[in-house]
Amino acid sequence: MDSNKVIVMDNGTGFVKCGFAGANFPTAIFPSMVGRPILRSEEKVENVEIKDIMVGDEAAKLRSMLQITYPLENGIIRNWDDITHVWDYALKEKLKVSDPTECKILLTEPPMNPVANRQKMIECMFEKYGFQAVYVAIQAVLTLYAQGLLTGVVVDSGDGVTHIIPVYEGYSIPHLTRRLDVAGRDVTRYLIKLLLLRGYAFNRTADFETIRQIKEKLCYVAYDVQQEMKLASETTVLVENYTLPDGRVIKVGQERFQASEALFNPSLVDVEGGGVHEQLFDCITKADRDLQQGFYQHIVLSGGSSMYPGLPSRLEKEIRSLYLERVLKGNKEGLAKFKCRIEDPPRRKHMVFLGGAVLADLTKDRDDFWITKAEYMEKGFGALDKLTKLSV
């Protein structure tokens, strides 16, 4: 089958990444949002026609005039009407798919996705769009494929949720999977709060996009927070100027590392539970002893919120210190034997899509892999049993 008849769709809380099998990069990346006009007074704004339903880039452009909704929350589809608008936009506007009945589609899902959700995704693909065949893959497993691995722990931090997922021989391990409800969106909100405390005036919704851009350009993870605080209070080396769209110039200093600290200390954004390092350590130490070494040596970062400079080294430092304290009980000599490696692939922002594109390309002609329309018509949701076995 022709690769451009095999679609790969990675639905994230913040962004949809979509394209074709075998691609090195998504064809389109757009915000996972739907907007409806608050007032129907004008037909066009900035050359964009105002429609009853606006999706993706178009909705983002006119967000101040729209009632915005996000179909996914914490990685899981919550609004089915809206997600079909998002899929319509992706297939028709972005990928220019004229006839889905000639195509196959690989969708991604978060770990611990409710079974009813998976069923509804498949039902929609066959009954609304009429695809020939469908496959649903767990995002973390795709990340490892993109990295050329079958076993490892994926720390996947996107816009709406951070997951820590151990994968062994291509199978994710649900009972060891950890979910942390702190991700990109929370760091952006926290950065707004920190800048408001500094006396800068922002509108929390309209300026959200601007602050997200500041975060992506200037924020980093401190290796040693105390050291950075000392630097920030005694010098101006950390201060960077940023010009806002309205021409104002703001100075961003210690907020550059304070915002991302929410990943390590969720209480900063009023979320209970341990930080990403504690959840990662907990996930590995609760695994079978034989698997732990392989997990420590293959910790793979994935998702847009793993892009902060300094994150890999800080995470490694925190894991080593937890290992020293809780496993070695303070015996520093044992630390020399402890091997921990954090892999931070340069293209990790789109790792899930890349893994999906590799998998879809390898399997595009294998009927034993995909759920076909005929199987779905015959067995209904029973056809989903195929997905529990993943052999590549």
UniProtKB/Swiss-Prot annotation:
GO terms for cellular component: Arp2/3 protein complex; cell cortex; cytosol; polyphosphate kinase complex; pseudopodium. Disulfide bonds: none annotated. ATP binds at residues 158-160, 212-216, 303-308. GO terms for molecular function: actin filament binding; ATP binding. Its main location: cytoplasm. GO terms for biological process: actin filament polymerization; aggregation involved in sorocarp development; Arp2/3 complex-mediated actin nucleation; bleb assembly; chemotaxis to cAMP; exocytosis; hyperosmotic response; phagocytosis. Keywords: Actin-binding, ATP-binding, Cell projection, Cytoplasm, Cytoskeleton, Nucleotide-binding. It is found in: Cytoplasm, Cytoskeleton; Cytoplasm, Cytosol; Cytoplasm, Cell cortex; Cell projection, Pseudopodium. Belongs to the actin family. ARP2 subfamily. Component of the Arp2/3 complex composed of arpB/Arp2, arpC/Arp3, arcA/p41-arc, arcB/p34-arc, arcC/p21-arc, arcD/p20-arc and arcE/p16-arc. Interacts with carmil (via the region between the LRR domain and COOH-terminal proline-rich domain); carmil is required for Arp2/3-dependent actin nucleation. Arp2/3 complex, MyoB, MyoC, and the alpha and beta subunits of capping protein all form a larger complex with carmil. Functions as ATP-binding component of the Arp2/3 complex which is involved in regulation of actin polymerization and together with an activating nucleation-promoting factor (NPF) mediates the formation of branched actin networks. Seems to contact the pointed end of the daughter actin filament. The Arp2/3 complex is involved in organizing the actin system in cell motility and chemotaxis, in phagocytosis and macropinocytosis, at late steps of endosome processing, and in mitosis. PANTHER family: ACTIN (PTHR11937). This is Actin-related protein 2. It comes from Dictyostelium discoideum. The lineage of its organism: Eukaryota, Amoebozoa, Evosea, Eumycetozoa, Dictyostelia. The gene is arpB.
